[in-house]
Amino acid sequence: MMLTTLRDANPIWNEVFANVDFLMVGTLERLGENGSLSESAALAALLLAKSLRLNHVALPLEEAELTRLCTEQLWTIRDESGGFSQAADIPHAATIQAGVQELRVLGPAVIDIQALDVPVSLTGTPLLISTRDGVPWFLSYRRYAYAEEIITSRLINAAHSTDLLDGVTGDEVVRTLGKIPMSEVGEQAIRFAVERKLSIITGGPGRGKTTVIASLLVGLRLTAERRGKKFSVALCAPTAKAAVRMEEAIKGQVSSLGETWEDLQRFVQIDDRSGSVHRLLGIRPDNTKSLRHLDHDFVIVDEVSMLDVSLLAKVIEHAPSTHLVFVGDADQLASVNVGAALRDMIDGAELAGLSGIVSKLNVNYRFRSEIDEFASAINRGNADEALEVMSRHPDVIRRATKADDLVRENVQWAQDLQMSAIASARGETSPSDLIAK
C-alpha cells in the first residue's frame, strides 16, 4: 500500500511522526514491491526513522525494550503545554516485529550480533536486521551499524592491549610533571592516553578536562626533550568555533603550568591543519570519501558529545595507528545528527567491563555548589531533588519560561529541516518538499 494511503488510513501517524520520518520511509518504499510497503512494514520503518531522530542508532526488537521505548519516546505526540505525552493506541510489539519480517522484501542484510568475526559491509540495501540466536534483535540502517562496529572494535582492542610509542609509558609521562598538581583521576587519564589507542576523558563543566589535556601535552614535551625525540599531535573539535575555543583554552592552561606554547611545539608538533574534524580529515562538499589518513602520534578531539556516530567512525577509521583521546561531557546535548556517540561509548565500556579507557573527572573547580547540586540531580533524573534545590536557591536557579518552550520547538524544527535538506541533496526528495517545511 502506498505511504500516502497509509497516512490517510492512520491519522494518528501524522501526529506521532514528523515529515522527515515519512521522507525517509518514502525512500524505502520505492524499493518495495510495486513501490509500496505493507502497513506493519511502514510502521516499523517509521519507528526506526523516529528513533534515529531521537539519537538512537537502531530500533530494538526485543519485546520489553521495544514496548518501553514506544511508550516513553516513540509513540508520543506534542501536548498543549508544548511537551510530549503518550499517544493513544500504542502498537503491540508483535505488530512491529511482524513489520520487520515484512521489510525483508527490501532485501536487508541479516547478521548475527554474536558472530563478531562477521563484519558489516557498507555495500548493499539500506536496512540491516541484527539477530540473536536467530531472533531479530535490532533494526538499523546499514551505515549506522557499520559505524557502530568500527567504534566498538576500537574500544575492545584498546581495552585489551597497550600500545607504547617508542616504549614511552604513562608513568614516565606523569613523573615528568613533577610538582604540577594533578588529581589521581587526571594522572590516570594521562596514563590511558599514552598507553591506549583510544581513551576517553569525560566530566562536566569545570571538572578540569582542559587542565588534563594541557598537562598531557606538557608531559609529552618534557618526555620528548629528555629522550631526544618529538611527538606529533593534532587538536580538533566538531566545529571551527569549538576548535578555536579549545586551542585558546589549552594555550592558557599550558601557560599556567609554566610553559610557553612556542617551547612546547619544539618537541610536540601541533598539526597546522588542526581545527574542525572536517578540516583535519579533509572533508568538503565535493569530497566525502577520499579522506586524509591521520598518522599523528596523538589526535585529541574535544566536545566529542557533538559528534554523530558516522563522523566519529570516520575519525577512528582514518587513524588506525594513532592514540585517539576523546574529550567531552557525556551529559551535554548530543549531536543533532544520529547517535549519542560519547555517552554510548562510556556506557558501552562500562557495561562490557572494558577497563583502561574511561577517566571520569568529578571534582568541580568552577561553579557554585548549588548549581552543581542542581545539575547533578537533573543528570540522575531525580526531579524531586532538583525541585528541592530550586526552592532553596531561588536567586540562583529559576523556572523555565514560555521562551524556553519556544527554543525547544525551534531546535526540533531545525533538526527536521536539516534532515530534509540532506534528503533533498541526495535526491531522495524534491526541493519543494524542503520548502514546504
Feature roles, as predicted:
Residues 209:
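Conserved lysine of the Walker
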Residues 233-295:
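Inter-Walker segment of RecA-like/P-loop motor cores
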Residues 302-303, 328:
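Walker B catalytic acidic pair
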Residues 185, 195-201, 231:
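Pre-Walker A (Motif I) flank of P-loop NTPase domains
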Residues 212, 216:
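Hydrophobic positions on the alpha1 helix immediately C-terminal to the Walker A/P-loop
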Residues 226, 331, 335-437:
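Conserved helicase motor core of P-loop NTPases
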